[in-house]
């Protein structure tokens, strides 16, 4: 299985070094030919920075893609990613630590952390800041974020610290998400709204996406965030209605999430709305299609679909690894249903490449439309 975070890379390095240190004495007793082979052989960099398997090898993959009873599926080649490296990755990581900020990229062990944090020639380096601490009051069975009934109190300096960090990075698109805080009166809506305000004060041109909780269905809290000055209102339904009780915390459900998305658009019609669905949890094609239709009927603008990845053995097992071709099919379905933007792929996540040109242009067009009215 490919390693998906820097901590895992460090762990691998220490294990390799430990084994090497234990075998130094044995090395001296090897024949010269074997010594030469080991000396000229690959090192750690050859494993972590080499090219990933190309598409031509995907067709030859013979492993099971659907889980049988008592089985744990092996990771197919199209889900293997590179270990995050580079100057921009390290810069973002260091800034976060210095300001005591958290990202969902790290806490949820996202496989795209190197790609999003690293940016690229045509991409915006994007880190999804996780507000209100790193401990959630809910226990969804797919999520690796820490949980507790009474997490530490909110940090009143977090909104300003977040704005300072984003200003230091020089980003033009930022994603704010949060843990669920059912222990806070408004679910943290005021805290999120204040963070958006601080960001806009420091940089009025910055585009802000908020991936929010459901606030226990409190539409006043939804309204508070929707009217905060954000550009994209995101809230994830996570899976099809039929699997909600199996996958999400009992306090969450599909209808409640749909009301959140609809209300955000009702109070702020020009905001871009967005949601995400994980595949590979046991859903059927008919259920996925019906869910997509329901989301579009609720006037959701953007949809992302990605492969569910089991973060630890304590979490839900992967029922199926969906092929890249099937994800492409769902992207085409999304376009046919009228979503303004559909991102569908094995490694796509709700905040994946949030600063892509299309989404940025969509926000810009809506702002231009409003200014002309």
Curated annotation (Swiss-Prot):
Residue interval of the organelle targeting sequence: 1-26
Q: Which gene encodes it?
A: Lias
This protein's name: Lipoyl synthase, mitochondrial
| Annotated TM spans | none
GO:BP terms for this protein? Answer: inflammatory response; lipoate biosynthetic process; neural tube closure; response to lipopolysaccharide; response to oxidative stress
Q: Which residues bind [4Fe-4S] cluster 2?
A: 136, 140, 143
Boundaries of each Radical SAM core domain copy? 121-340
Mind listing the UniProt keywords for this protein, alphabetically? 4Fe-4S, Iron, Iron-sulfur, Metal-binding, Mitochondrion, S-adenosyl-L-methionine, Transferase, Transit peptide
Tell me the cofactors it needs.
[4Fe-4S] cluster
């Amino acid at each position: 299985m490919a390693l998906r975070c820097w901590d895992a890379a460090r762990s691998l390095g220490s294990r390799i070094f430990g084994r090497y240190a234990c075998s130094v004495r044995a090395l001296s007793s090897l024949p010269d030919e074997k010594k030469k082979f080991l000396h000229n052989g690959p090192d750690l960099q050859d494993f972590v920075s080499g090219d990933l398997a190309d598409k031509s090898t995907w067709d030859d993959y013979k492993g099971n893609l659907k889980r049988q009873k008592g089985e744990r599926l092996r990771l197919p080649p199209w889900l293997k990613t590179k270990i995050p490296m580079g100057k921009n990755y390290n810069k973002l990581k260091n800034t976060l630590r210095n300001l005591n900020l958290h990202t969902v990229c790290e806490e949820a062990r996202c496989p795209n952390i190197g790609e999003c944090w690293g940016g690229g020639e045509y991409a915006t380096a994007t880190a999804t800041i996780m507000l209100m601490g790193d401990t959630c009051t809910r226990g969804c069975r797919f999520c690796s974020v820490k949980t507790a009934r009474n997490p530490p109190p909110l940090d009143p300096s977090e909104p300003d610290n977040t704005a300072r960090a984003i200003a230091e990075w020089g980003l033009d698109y930022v994603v704010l998400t949060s843990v669920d805080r059912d222990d806070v009166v408004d679910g943290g809506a005021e805290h999120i709204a204040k963070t958006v305000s601080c960001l806009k004060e420091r940089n009025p041109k910055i585009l802000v996406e908020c991936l929010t909780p459901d606030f226990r269905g409190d539409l006043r809290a939804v309204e508070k965030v929707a009217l905060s000055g954000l550009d994209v209102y995101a809230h994830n339904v996570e899976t099809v209605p039929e699997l909600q009780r199996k996958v999400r915390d009992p306090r969450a459900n599909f209808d409640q999430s749909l009301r959140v998305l609809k209300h955000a658009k009702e109070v702020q019609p020009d905001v871009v709305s967005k949601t995400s669905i994980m595949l590979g949890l046991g859903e059927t094609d008919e259920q996925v299609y019906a869910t997509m239709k329901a989301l579009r009927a609720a006037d959701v603008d953007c949809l992302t679909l990605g492969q569910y990845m089991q973060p630890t053995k304590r979490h839900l097992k992967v029922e199926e690894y969906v092929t890249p071709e099937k994800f492409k099919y769902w992207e085409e379905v999304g376009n046919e249903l009228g979503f303004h933007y559909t991102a569908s792929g094995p490694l796509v996540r709700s905040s994946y490449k949030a600063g892509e040109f299309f989404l940025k242009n969509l926000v810009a067009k809506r702002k231009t439309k409003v200014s002309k009215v």
